[in-house]
């Protein structure tokens, strides 16, 4: 278990999003089953926390950008700052939609669901433009892709809720089934490649392990997600009688898996909260005592052999560096052995 690799590849932005979605789905299922009688404004509290962190992070990042013009000449700084602004714009539109949903459910002050879904209708074309910009600048935009491909699904759901169309929910979700079919093909692709790599002797163990991990991750995400959607559609069409909590269980499995995968995803915009560096380096500078734990790795298979090997007393072990930064700060691993210095020798001179 290499804690250094876990911290280096951690993506805090995605972890926050998946954690908020998981907590929101738990509260929503309990509210729909009547187990809790909270207001929907309270049920949406994890969503408000998510959007609040986005707004605060973007505000701090913009302030750092405005007060430090010298940072704008550093590599891909301008591209990352523009990507942050695009993400903030999309999140504000999503926040508007979520506020309208709560207002419609609590007070019914908005007569039509089409008006509630209007922010999502604006999000889709903006997301398409953001995806084009992201492809040109080699940026990963998962949220923008998700919003851009679901425009037809948003329209069908709004029409169904307003009673303009009387289709069953199984037909209303046809765009969703098309998207899930594509994801199932992706899962099949990873499974096939994993099997081929397992049977090939020319592939190194690291590549084989990576493809197997990807295949298992995609299966654990897509299969429970598809199960949740099928159960939800049958529940809405009155073909499934149990409560909403069993329906949401597969969704929780997918979200927990997504949270675990954030520890192996590099990336993240460095301009959130103006930290301008990887989240791991930021934590190590903010909390220096974490360096001792971040530099530890365990190898249970070679523990006995390592114990049998003794280093010479007069030989100073070389300590590999963990991070190298332009500022010249180097964080080194803690040495595995410490040697007691020899006692002080006193020589009495004869009279």
Swiss-Prot record:
Record's subcellular location: Membrane
Keyword tags: Membrane, Transmembrane, Transmembrane helix
Transmembrane segments: 16-36, 41-61, 81-101, 113-133, 154-174, 178-198, 212-232, 244-264
InterPro entries associated with the record: TM_Fragile-X-F-assoc
Keyword Transmembrane attached: yes
Topology in the lipid bilayer: Multi-pass membrane protein
Family, similarity comment: Belongs to the TMEM185 family.
Name of the molecule in the record: Transmembrane protein 185-like
UniProt source species: Danio rerio
Classification of source organism: Eukaryota, Metazoa, Chordata, Craniata, Vertebrata
């Amino acid at each position: 278990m290499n804690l250094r690799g876990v911290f280096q590849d951690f993506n805090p932005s995605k972890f926050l999003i998946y954690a908020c979605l998981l907590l929101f789905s738990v509260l929503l299922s309990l509210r729909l089953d009547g187990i809790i009688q909270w207001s929907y404004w309270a049920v949406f509290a994890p969503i408000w926390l998510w959007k609040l962190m986005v707004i605060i992070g973007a505000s701090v990042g913009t302030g750092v950008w405005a007060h430090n013009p010298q940072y704008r000449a550093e590599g891909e700084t301008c591209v990352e700052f523009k990507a942050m602004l695009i993400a903030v714009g999309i999140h504000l539109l999503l926040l508007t939609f979520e506020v309208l949903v709560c207002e419609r459910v609590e007070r019914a002050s908005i007569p039509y669901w089409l008006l509630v879904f209007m922010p999502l209708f604006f999000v889709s074309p903006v997301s398409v433009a953001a995806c084009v910009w992201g492809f040109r600048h080699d940026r990963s935009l998962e949220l923008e892709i998700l919003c851009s491909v679901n425009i037809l699904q948003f329209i069908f759901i709004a029409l169904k809720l307003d009673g303009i169309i009387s289709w069953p929910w199984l037909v209303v979700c046809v765009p969703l089934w098309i998207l899930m079919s594509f994801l199932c093909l992706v899962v099949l692709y990873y499974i096939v490649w994993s099997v081929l790599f397992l049977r090939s002797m020319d592939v190194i163990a690291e590549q084989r392990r990576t493809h197997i991990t990807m295949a298992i991750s995609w299966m654990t995400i897509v299969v429970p997600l598809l199960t949740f959607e099928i159960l939800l559609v049958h529940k809405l069409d009155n073909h499934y009688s149990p409560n909403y909590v069993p329906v949401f269980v597969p969704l929780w499995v997918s979200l927990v898996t997504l949270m675990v995968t954030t520890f192996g995803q590099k990336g993240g915009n460095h301009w959130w909260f103006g930290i301008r560096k990887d989240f791991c380096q930021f934590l190590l500078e903010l909390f220096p005592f974490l360096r001792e734990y971040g530099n530890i790795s365990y190898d249970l298979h070679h523990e006995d052999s390592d114990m049998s090997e003794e280093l010479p007393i007069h030989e100073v072990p070389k300590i590999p560096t963990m991070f190298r930064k332009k500022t010249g700060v180097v964080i080194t691993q803690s040495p595995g052995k410490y040697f007691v210095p020899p006692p002080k020798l006193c020589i009495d001179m004869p009279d």
